[in-house]
């Protein structure tokens, strides 16, 4: 209880900056670097867990040490478990870069917390997947606010001992009360994500099972569609034992606390499988939401030269290749799948869903002025109402 109340409090604090979501006036004026100079000796990065490794978790996964040796820029990482936490940290300041998902990136741009980047200072920009170069979650009015980093789906992780030879095919195992294949109820044995963006997972489920609602995008909901999504989440609340936002706590819950099904990231699935835990994952028939993360530079970066050096380094195909294996996700640089510079292979990228880009409903920030209908429920409502759902209201 304490953990998800703390998460709700962080999300409530975000309401203070919610007006930024209502409109975006256009890119602010920033003095872009015209050349990369000598490094300042340090770069401070806000990142998702597992995104920036220096061999401390597993020694073969290290893309920090050689960068530090080559540039003299010491990498300091602050992990964040939700997009709202990332936005809050960037608002506080003191960081150079952030690996932001689409439900954070546009907020950071609108709030002028990140600056446009000069792609001519990033030689590896030309190697970026064409599907990502002009993606709307980091490109506004033709201006780029970051370099793509990694992308992938939110998967349904499950316990193989519980599901046996009947792996789940639908998200209903975490949304609807039922007995699982082991004959026991799912109540108290499933989890849900501790973040308002989980409303989109409910909407995605309804897109498939209630087509009469007319949902075109899980991030663009009118009042009726939104109300149905909240009702589904309230039903789910009765089933959920814990709302997760810490990847490592979720892994412990699957190992030691009897959790058997939850939305998750490939990162947790891969680590648990490496520990010989009986877990696997699927993308169910309803499809999945997902994330495409961008390395963005703080508007007040104190170490801009090191920041640009890191953005270039982050697109190296060997780093992209190893990160793709480590996180179970897809590289922003397609050559990372085939050039043999890292651990990843073409088969591995296919397994991670490289060809499923069009099937994933990528996280983005819900706004009132939406494309699919006249008016949609904006994100600040998602924040306040999801706090209510978690609190049992």
Protein language model regions, located:
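Bacterial N-terminal signal peptides
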Residues: 11-25
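Periplasmic-binding protein-like
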Residues: 127, 227-236, 275-296, 345
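Extracytoplasmic ligand-binding site segments that recognize negatively charged/polar headgroups
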Residues: 48, 52-59, 99-249
């Amino acid at each position: 209880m304490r953990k998800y109340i703390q998460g709700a409090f962080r999300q409530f604090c975000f309401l203070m900056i919610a007006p930024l979501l209502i409109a975006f006036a256009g890119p602010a004026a920033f003095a872009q670097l015209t050349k990369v100079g000598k490094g300042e000796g340090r770069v401070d990065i806000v990142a998702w867990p597992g995104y920036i490794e220096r061999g401390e978790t597993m020694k073969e996964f290290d893309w920090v040490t050689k960068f530090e040796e080559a540039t003299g820029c010491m990498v300091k990482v602050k992990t964040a478990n939700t997009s709202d936490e990332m936005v809050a940290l960037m608002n506080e300041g003191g960081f150079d870069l952030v690996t932001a998902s689409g439900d954070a990136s546009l907020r950071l741009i609108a709030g002028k917390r990140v600056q446009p980047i000069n792609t001519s200072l990033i030689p590896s920009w030309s190697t970026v997947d064409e599907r990502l170069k002009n993606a709307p979650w980091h490109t506004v009015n033709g201006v780029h606010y970051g370099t793509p980093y990694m992308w992938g789906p939110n998967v349904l992780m499950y316990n193989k001992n519980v599901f046996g030879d009947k792996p789940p095919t639908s998200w209903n195992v975490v949304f609807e009360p039922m007995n699982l294949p082991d004959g026991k109820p799912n109540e108290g044995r499933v989890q849900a994500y501790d973040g308002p963006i989980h409303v989109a997972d409910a909407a995605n489920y309804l897109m498939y099972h209630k087509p009469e609602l007319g949902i075109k995008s899980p991030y663009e909901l009118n009042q009726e569609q939104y109300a149905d999504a909240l009702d589904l989440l309230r039903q789910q609340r009765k089933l959920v034992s814990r709302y997760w936002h810490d990847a490592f706590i979720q892994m412990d819950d699957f190992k030691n606390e009897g959790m058997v099904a939850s939305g998750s990231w490939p990162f947790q699935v891969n680590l648990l499988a490496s520990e010989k835990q009986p877990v696997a994952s699927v993308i169910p028939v309803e499809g999945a939401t997902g994330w495409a993360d961008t390395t963005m530079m703080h508007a007040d970066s104190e170490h801009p030269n090191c920041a640009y050096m890191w953005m270039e380094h982050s697109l190296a195909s060997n780093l992209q290749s190893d990160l793709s294996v480590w996180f179970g996700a897809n590289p922003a640089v397609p050559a990372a799948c085939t050039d043999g510079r890292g651990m990843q292979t073409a088969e591995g990228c296919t397994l991670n869903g490289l060809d499923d880009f069009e099937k994933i409903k990528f996280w983005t920030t819900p706004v009132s002025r939406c494309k699919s209908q006249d008016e949609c429920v904006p994100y600040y409502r998602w924040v306040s109402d999801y706090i209510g759902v978690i609190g049992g209201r």
